[in-house]
């Protein structure tokens, strides 16, 4: 990005604004609270407390045009091979809508709709049995997305099926889950793109044995033959996914099977509708009015121009407590790259470390560092305008904390006692859902997906591969024989010492 024609001008704006007080920016642009705010369907965004002004934004948009960001969106939605290292499309958007006239995207949309119809039929069959509980086994993209949505949207009471998620290879996770269940009234779903994932295969074997066979086992995989063979699952109970959908973008596919079981098939379809509506905004809205673009450019500005190494996400709705963990994978696995599309080294820092938690709990853990620490941490505050629980006073208090914390972070407060002084100047974006509905959550997740893509285009990297996860897995497989005492051929001296400790 530093090699673009407009970078010097952008850098000059950063130098000008780095030490600017956020109240001074608001004073200089009196209409800023509304001019930097956007309503897109059920989502409201306010960027007024970010440390840029109109001139800096114009410079950011100029670089976005130089990087052909609008064309990049077209290539993504039309099914071109934007995943250049694996020579694949990234058509997660086709799982939820058909927004272009590109034949490949339309074909993928039709294929996904057919599989979704099959999934709906399987759900009807399951609901007609005496099964009360579902154990969903997967990891990474096969777990984080479904777990987030199921937890956020599950009914408070009266659910026909209870869905439990197991991901960690640690046997304690499976033991604790199965201890509360009856195998005669439980079904299992094994989700793995390749069906070669160690965690899913080991946990799947435990679940298969505990259930007494495969009669109530289902699978979702891009390798359905291997899935059926590995656990003797009838082909009719195996749902496909495809190599044109990355794992962390797959909750909209049959990977969402446990979501639909937890919240109902109709509400699962509403989730997809909400995502498709935001997709249309991302694809068709001019850059300067495009919220996904502005969110992504804001992340680039904070990372590359203001030097922020981390980004916090605070969800002021307990039902969204798992969103920071989901975004951690979505953002860091997509953008944690050090080479560009052509294999050359990047010319600027890429992804920030994303982290966070649920408010107001986090105010009593890490907010001390946000307010008075030496690192400036940009943040997203996410809340809901309307809540459907019966405790209205609690919701008012919750939203009061959103308003108070964002104001305090931005404005700070002087004191004659340095220990009680707040420097301010901490930027944040506020995102408000009209209510936590399937449509709103679908739109929110879609926004973050597109923000990630914007950042990848600005940096010239591939958001859709994840080769960085492979080496550790390969070494773990090689070390298994040594841990079992079958081999002692380990080259690394520290690993040898640790093995001796583990083997006693």
Swiss-Prot record:
The active site is at residues 333, 364, 473. Its main location: cytoplasm. One of its GO terms (biological process) is glycolytic process. Keywords: Cytoplasm, Gluconeogenesis, Glycolysis, Isomerase. This is Glucose-6-phosphate isomerase. CDD domains: SIS_PGI_1, SIS_PGI_2. SUPFAM superfamilies: SIS domain. GO terms for cellular component: cytosol. It holds the Pfam family PGI.
